[in-house]
UniProtKB/Swiss-Prot annotation:
Biased composition annotated in UniProt, kind: Low complexity: 27-49
Lipidation feature positions (N-palmitoyl cysteine): 22
Compartment(s) of residence: Cell membrane
Superkingdom: Bacteria
Main location: membrane
Protein task: Might be involved in ligand transport. A host TLR2 agonist, modifies host gene expression in response to pathogen.
Organism: Mycobacterium tuberculosis (strain CDC 1551 / Oshkosh)
Listed name of the protein: Lipoprotein LpqH
Region (Disordered): 24-51
GO cellular component entries: plasma membrane
Signal peptide per UniProt: 1-21
Taxonomic classification: Bacteria, Bacillati, Actinomycetota, Actinomycetes, Mycobacteriales
InterPro entries with a match to the protein in the record: LpqH (IPR008691)
Comment field on protein domains: Forms a U-shaped beta-half-barrel with a large hydrophobic cavity.
Length: 159
């Protein structure tokens, strides 16, 4: 169980680093891949900006929202490299959540990866609006033998 949790957290951390490093405000189309960037900044109550809630607490996420569709997946990256949040969904309707990386929250790197038996996630799609909810897992380095589970909710619109 500990190995699966470690693999899930490491995979989520790599996903966040990789996707947030690709954030730009360019929109390209070619070879079956589509990238869309929405230059939005989140503010409390902003309907068009990304909304991220972890463990019942609204996260102040700022930066671009980048959505890339390739090989049957939708890759969503929110924010910059330091505060990046990422998700990979299938492009179906409803989409299936493959992974979510929430970054470091109060000293705990949180993530979800399907098939690991750790946490859970589901998603809905309404046009270009996505809502992803679930429970992410992580390891608190102050107590590494006790896994941490936190609920999360992500709402984002790809333009």
């Amino acid at each position: 169980m500990k190995r699966g949790l470690t693999v899930a957290v490491a995979g989520a951390a790599i996903l966040v680093a990789g996707l947030s490093g690709c954030s730009s405000n360019k929109s390209t189309t070619g070879s079956g891949e589509t990238t869309t960037a929405a230059g939005t900044t989140a503010s409390p109550g902003a309907a068009s900006g990304p909304k991220v809630v972890i463990d019942g607490k609204d996260q102040n996420v700022t930066g671009s929202v980048v959505c890339t569709t390739a090989a049957g997946n939708v890759n969503i990256a929110i924010g910059g490299a330091a505060t990046g949040i990422a998700a990979v969904l299938t492009d179906g309707n409803p989409p299936e959540v493959k992974s979510v990386g929430l970054g470091n929250v109060n000293g705990v790197t949180l993530g979800y990866t399907s098939g690991t038996g750790q946490g859970n996630a589901s998603a809905t799609k309404d046009g270009s609006h996505y809502k992803i909810t679930g429970t992410a897992t992580g390891v608190d380095m102050a107590n590494p033998m006790s896994p941490v589970n936190k609920s999360f909710e992500i709402e984002v619109t790809s333009s």
